[in-house]
Amino acid sequence: MAYAPIIIKEPKVLSEDQGRCRRLRIGLGARVYSNRLFEEIAHFFDVHPEIEVTFVTEAGQDFFVPMREGKLDVAIDRLPPVQLIPDRGGFVSWPLIRERQCILMAESDPRSRLTGMTFQDLQGCAVITGLENSMEDRTLKQECRDFGVTLNRIYRSDGIETDMKLLRKGMGVIIGPESFADYYHVAAVPLVPEVMVSLDFICLKKNANRPEIAALRKQLAKVCKEKAPCE
């Protein structure tokens, strides 16, 4: 009896039939772009056309609420302070890239020549952050409470480009990652004592083993290990 040859193909994350009704909604923090990671994310979906993707990129967005409500599947962003995440036990996260947290300022700012600044050095300063009650804004307020710092003024916006224009004009400073300096052409003075913050892959625990989520996480972990291994 003759048998048909067996052809083995590289499996897709999802079958074509599943892919037509399967969507992946991803929240992206600004650190994704400053660490040149968006190109890798886009490439993943280029080779997996069976997954329909939507990106949410609002600056300072609280991604945890829409994930909990089932409106978002994954967030790739920094983790906020523990006390700002209710029901944190329902989420799981994996660090992708770790970098120093800095005080960002205009390159013309005299303080840009310093080798380090403490959070207390922000006393009486103007700071640029996200919209009121956004995760970015609440994180700033929490840090000010923790260090007993009173700011002189706060500028808020919902766009990172607006934030950076304010920064370059010397209107205030931003607390952010070291990678912003090169990406946005601003100065970065490291916080002292050193504060390391990671860009994390975050999702609900119950969704962690979904094939498309697991595949994306593993691919990004591989890429980031080559870029800047997490210790």
Residue map of PLM features:
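Short beta-strand-centered segments that line the small-molecule binding cleft or hinge
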Residues: E39-H43, Q61-Q101, M105, H185-V189
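Alpha-helical "hinge/linker" immediately C-terminal to small N-terminal DNA-binding modules
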Residues: M1-Q18, D77
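Hydrophobic hinge/microswitch elements
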Residues: A59, R68-L72, R78, N133-A187
